[in-house]
Structures are given as C-alpha cells and as structure tokens.
C-alpha cells in the first residue's frame, strides 16, 4: 500500500536519494534543495511504502504572463520514484494527490514539462492548445497545462514562467 503525505524534515535525505536515483544525476535533487531554501509556497509530497520514502513530487509557484494580466499557479517539477518501485502506481498517486491538494488551495493551473505519454491521463493537455508557451525552447507536446479553474484561466494566453531556481 502507498501512503502519500507532506514531506517532513526527517525526509530530506531520502527525498534527495529518490531524485538522484530516479534521474541518475544531481540536478533535480539540487533544484529541490534550492526551491525549499528560497520559496515558502511549495507543495512537497512523499510516497511511503514499507516505511520507506520511495517517491517524491514537488509543486512550486509559476505564472502565465498574458497581455491582459498575469495569473499565478503552480509548476510540477520534479516528480521521482525509486527505480525499483516504478511501474507500481507510485507516481500516479503522487500526481493525483498533488492535483487534489492544489484544487483545494484554489490554484488555477498546473504546468509540467514532461512525458507526453504520461501526463495526459491526469488531464494535462499541450499548453499550446491554450496559446500558452514555455519560456524555454521545448517540444509543444512535452509542455503541458492542467486547468483547475476555468473562470480564472478564461482568455489567458502567453508565456509560462517558472521560478528563477529552474534556470
């Protein structure tokens, strides 16, 4: 059984290990540390199985800058699961739980730069469908948006901006 809960201070080392092992490099783990250090408005969840942290997902503030106005929402990045626990629904539970919490917090959207074959099952669509593009050069099918509040997002198009820690 998978338990999804908010990260706790005792989880920091395990979260770092999950990100390093899942991505095979330090970049994502370092990003998590920088965001945690510089940003108070994060949603950081862990997946626990057999009393072990086996997955992690982080949502951080993002914005979409339109000609008319700027809308504040959240970005999903990174999401990681230990290799030996992949293909067991851990990532899906992390994403679903995170989205539910962001809806509760009234976030109007979530953006993700990720696998085009994975994230649509949660309702993500290419952001280009909404006239929204990333601040970086990325494939249209990999940059996706999940609208959580239609009324807040009505008429919004433009550039999605991540926090400076991402650059």
What is each PLM-predicted segment?
Residues 1-31, 38-54, 75, 150-167:
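Short amphipathic alpha-helix that is part of the acyltransferase structural core
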Residues 32-36, 131-133:
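Short, solvent-exposed loop/turn elements at beta->coil junctions and helix N-caps
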Residues 42, 141-144:
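Short hydrophobic/aromatic beta-strand or adjacent loop that forms the aromatic wall/cage
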Residues 60, 94-98, 126-130:
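Short acidic (Asp/Glu) patches
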Residues 63-75, 86:
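A conserved beta-turn-beta hairpin within the catalytic core of GNAT-like acetyltransferases
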Residues 76, 81, 87-100, 112:
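Conserved acetyl-CoA-binding loop-helix of GNAT-fold acetyltransferases
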Residues 104-108, 113-138:
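Conserved active-site alpha-helix within GNAT-family acetyltransferase domains
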């Amino acid at each position: 059984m998978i338990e999804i809960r908010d990260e706790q201070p005792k989880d920091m080392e395990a979260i770092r290990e999950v990100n390093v092992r899942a991505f095979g490099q330090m970049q994502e783990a370092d990003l998590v540390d920088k965001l945690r250090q510089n940003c108070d408005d994060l949603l950081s969840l862990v997946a626990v199985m057999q009393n072990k942290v086996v997955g992690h997902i982080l949502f951080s503030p993002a914005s979409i800058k339109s000609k008319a106005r700027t809308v504040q929402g959240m970005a999903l990045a990174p999401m990681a699961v230990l290799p030996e626990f992949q293909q067991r629904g851990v990532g899906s539970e992390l994403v679903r739980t995170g989205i539910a919490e962001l809806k509760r917090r009234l976030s109007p959207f979530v953006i993700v730069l990720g696998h085009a074959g994975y994230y649509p099952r949660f309702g993500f669509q290419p952001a280009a469908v909404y006239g929204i593009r990333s601040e970086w050069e990325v494939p249209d099918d990999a940059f996706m948006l999940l609208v959580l509040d239609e009324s807040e997002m009505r008429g919004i198009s433009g550039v999605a901006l991540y926090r400076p820690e991402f650059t």
